């Protein structure tokens, strides 16, 4: 089963956690508890009848956890940008987030699956942001899908993830490439380093030479072996493992991934409907 990483981003207090919990568990979170990091999983069915796994990272909206947010953006394939219709500041912040995503991913926004959600649309009496202006703004940004949502009354949340899933399927060719320019640069540097290492080994093996070691002994290198064969090593103050010479140049630290707590997961068959853009 194919797994896609989705990151939910937006200002603090816009209802990111409530939207995510409503989508994954079908529940509404009444109390506000600032999030540091929560990972949710849900299996959904695509419009082609295939099942995929969405790993949804609910992030903090505070500046304190920017370093963590960078890591999530770098590893994610899709993004949910959330603002509150009761806060114009939260809408203005989305443009900075959108620009930063493009910078980290090193791609145009047209190649990145992304939806913009205007949350808390059940609070009509305190609305300060209207759908017409946001629709014009997202069109200017190049974002395909914009919806107004409500975690409280469960409005348009399923439709939002339907739209995001369709984008994931249609932009599959971009997702299969390198996640960003930095990855391409790292791969190029590794390839160059490997080539240089190979050239150095070839120059060592191409001719016989005599190396002076402690105690006045000679260390012979034979060109007839693919891996250097050493002989006539005597009167040395300590025995040396020759094989470690090559290994010490190629060994690299192994990175491990920390475990994250996973919330509940369930299988949901999405209705195959057209995305509703408000």
Swiss-Prot record:
Q: Which residues form the propeptide?
A: 276-278
The processes (GO biological process) annotated in the record are: mitotic cytokinesis; negative regulation of cell-substrate adhesion; negative regulation of substrate adhesion-dependent cell spreading; positive regulation of cell migration; positive regulation of positive chemotaxis to cAMP; regulation of cytokinesis; regulation of sorocarp development; signal transduction
Q: What is its main location?
A: membrane
Q: Which gene encodes it?
A: rapC
Q: Which reaction does it catalyse?
A: GTP + H2O = GDP + phosphate + H(+)
GO cellular component labels: plasma membrane
**Species per Swiss-Prot/TrEMBL record:** Dictyostelium discoideum (Social amoeba)
Name of the protein: Ras-related protein rapC
Q: Which residues carry this modification: Cysteine methyl ester?
A: 275
Q: Which GO terms describe its molecular function?
A: G protein activity; GDP binding; GTP binding; GTPase activity
Taxonomy, superkingdom: Eukaryota
Q: Where is the composition biased (Low complexity)?
A: 198-209, 236-251
Read off the InterPro entries from this record.
Answer: P-loop_NTPase, Small_GTP-bd, Small_GTPase, Small_GTPase_Ras-type
* S-geranylgeranyl cysteine lipid sites: 275
Which keywords accompany this UniProt record? Answer: Cell membrane, GTP-binding, Hydrolase, Lipoprotein, Membrane, Methylation, Nucleotide-binding, Prenylation
UniProt record similarity statement: Belongs to the small GTPase superfamily. Ras family.
């Amino acid at each position: 089963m194919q797994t896609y990483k989705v990151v939910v981003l937006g200002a603090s207090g816009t209802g990111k956690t409530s939207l995510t919990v409503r989508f994954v568990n079908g529940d509404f979170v009444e109390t506000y508890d600032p999030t540091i990091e929560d990972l949710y999983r849900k299996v959904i069915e695509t419009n082609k009848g295939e099942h995929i796994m969405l790993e949804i990272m609910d992030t903090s909206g505070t500046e304190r956890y920017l370093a963590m947010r960078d890591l999530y953006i770098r590893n994610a394939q899709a993004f949910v940008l959330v603002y509150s219709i009761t806060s114009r500041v939260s809408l203005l912040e989305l443009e900075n987030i959108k620009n930063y995503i493009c910078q980290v991913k090193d791609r145009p926004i047209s190649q990145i699956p992304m939806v913009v959600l205007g949350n808390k649309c059940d609070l009509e009496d305190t609305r300060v942001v209207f759908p017409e202006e946001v629709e014009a703004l997202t069109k200017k940004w190049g974002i395909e899908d914009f919806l107004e949502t409500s975690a409280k009354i469960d409005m348009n949340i399923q439709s939002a993830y339907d739209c995001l899933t369709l984008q994931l399927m249609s932009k599959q060719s971009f997702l299969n490439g390198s996640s960003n320019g930095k990855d391409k640069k790292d791969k190029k540097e590794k390839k160059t380093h490997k080539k240089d290492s190979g050239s150095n080994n070839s120059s060592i093996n191409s001719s016989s030479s005599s190396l002076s070691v402690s105690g006045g002994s000679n260390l012979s290198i034979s060109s007839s072996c693919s891996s250097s064969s050493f002989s006539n090593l005597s009167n040395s103050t300590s025995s040396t493992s020759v094989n470690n010479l090559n290994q010490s140049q190629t060994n690299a630290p192994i990175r491990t991934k920390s475990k994250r707590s996973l919330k509940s997961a369930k299988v949901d068959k999405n209705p195959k409907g057209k995305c509703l853009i408000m």
